[in-house]
Amino acid sequence: MHRRWLSGLRFEQAVQHVVLEDLIAAVEAATERRDRLTRQIEAVLPEWSLASVAQALQALRGVALVNAVTLVAELGDITRFASPRQLMAYLGLVPSEQSSGQSRRQGGITKAGNGAARRMLIEAAWSYRFPARVSRDLLLRQEGLPQPVRATAWKAQLRLCRRYRRLAHAGKPATVVTTAIARELAGFVWAIAHQRARHAA
């Protein structure tokens, strides 16, 4: 649909049309590469020892195949974190702190730890700006998953959508809101990974 609309654009100078066509070709090449890599991930996923965790994480809104696989590949065995707070700290999603004597000041997030996994959570967090609902794609991703995992994912969606609206309504910048949502989302990732570990045992 977008391609058709772009093809219909007319420019005063021919060089502008050449540049547009070049940009369209670059987007199409990137899309084909993404699709090819996604198919390869789908093909090897069943053989992976952490596949069940990656599949379970897809129950969360904003966490599709590539996002889930990246999170699990970057974090490894998520059950090694004793608490959600440890995972949040590892991801650099906790506030920095400067303390001196009796004064204590918190700043922005530390950005310590795994940047790739943190980016995946922040990307996923943007989807919580919309009202809570189970889309057709999300329903397909949740098919066959245990009820406790689906219940946790729905609880996450209700809480995070509400929190996103509340923070945005309070006038917080979008990046601050999204980072706060990503931090809480990490807690739900931790919970689902632990549910899968108990289910597998």
Which role does the model predict for each range below?
Residues 1-201:
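A detector of single, family-specific signature residues
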